[in-house]
Amino acid sequence: MAPAARPSAAWRLVFALSLLLGAALPASAQTVATYHGHADRSGNFVMPQFTWARARTLHLDTGFAPRFTGHLYAQPLYWRPAGSTSGVLIVASESNVVAAIDSRSGATLWSRSLGPPAPLSTFPCGNIDPLGVTGTPVIDPASGTLYLDAMVLDGGRPHQRVYALSLGDGAVKPGWPIDVADALRAAGHRFDPRVQNQRAALLLLNGTVYIGFGGFYGDCGDYHGWVVGVPTGRPDHVLVWRSQARGGAVWAPGGIASDGRFLYFSTGNTFGARKWAGGEAVFRMPPSLQSSGGPSSFFAPADWRQLDASDLDLGATNPLPLALQGGAQPLLLALGKDRRAYLLDRQNLGGIGGSLVSRRVAARPILTAPALYAQDGSAKVVFQGRGADCPSVRDGDLTVLRIIPGNPPGLATAWCGAMSGRGAPIVTTTDGASEPIVWILGAEGDNRLHGFRGDDGTALYTGPPLQGLRHFQTLIAADNRLFVGADGRLYAFSLSP
């Protein structure tokens, strides 16, 4: 393992002070510590300067051009050490390079190589070459620790390893990394990293890091869906959930969501299952990952067999917890490659066929993470995908749904946005609710950053083409700017004075 580039003495002092003072600042002002900024994966960022009027002045900051090694699929993270005048951007690439970058100057504060990534030829199928870090890492601001999973080639064999790195200098913390196959073997399970891939964003909840695993593009080998919980204090004592049948991948880029009490995740298609065995489903799990298995703890569409046969699974998109105004029941939204939206009772997911509402909302399979915002007494959910009910004048690869309180709740298309590509959206508001703006990257499409008014879909901003965007790429909002990760580099967008 290569040593980290040595951070400056000034940076080491700032890092030490941040651990002492971190509790003094609200977390939202300091960090984008996880995928979509929140454990619930809402993707809603408070940015007081980002009004509808000023969004039209956004521009690419050409003076900000940090570089690193490797392709980038994981979302960047942002951490503001207490007492610091600038934040730190964290990127983790498919070359197994993790870098900390000053958010103002673009200077590299430290860089760490976790070891050689695995070439595609190592695996019986797949589409990422080489394969290193794919799932978005997670930050624990209280301890100044970054947790991530990496595929490392060691002794000619691939290994899934979970790392804990110091945010101060990138050093691997004592007791880490954890070899996933070894930890699961000690718990009585067989895990083969040659057919088990890690795409889902990591989640940190109550001192445990939760990691979803699935298969490779091509569905080769005897893989299963897994959720592995790694306690940060005892990383060799893992918690485990596994799909019963072959398949059932936990692979959505948004990973596992949480409302602070339970974990929510979706699974992909299974193979050869004569009775339902954990695929095509949404699960609610306690942090122990031990569930009764009753119908209140899972949902699967009634046509799960047909979805299995057609590879139209629910596993491509993370579930989204939401609540409507007026004290209505807490809900969970699931979106599928079957082009449907499913509204579920979060306290009773309903078992097979037990959704509150099921409606076709997209003209094509839905594949990326949704985002959530509130407006006019309803919840709005935005996803990348061509809507089923879009007006032709606004036809494009962005759809916003409106969820209306009621018994059952109402579900309708609010508006659609004209753009092309497969990024995942986020939302900025000035105070948590006002002047919402939907932002999305046209990754592997027009490759531009787009901004739309959240109330009616009016286009506010279309940026220049960007190089190196990978599908499902997700931007973040922090430090009065928007940051975009791409192969080997970061972009920043700023408002004009």
Spans of features found by a protein language model:
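Compositionally biased, intrinsically disordered low-complexity segments
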Residues: 7, 17, 183, 435-437
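Bacterial N-terminal signal peptides
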Residues: 12-24
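Detector for outer-membrane/organellar transmembrane beta-barrel domains
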Residues: 395-400, 405-424
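N-terminal secretory signal peptides that target proteins for export/translocation
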Residues: 1-10
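Short, charged low-complexity linker/loop segments at the C-terminal edge of domains
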Residues: 408, 496-497
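Inter-blade linker and blade-boundary elements of WD-repeat/beta-propeller domains
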Residues: 353-363, 412-415
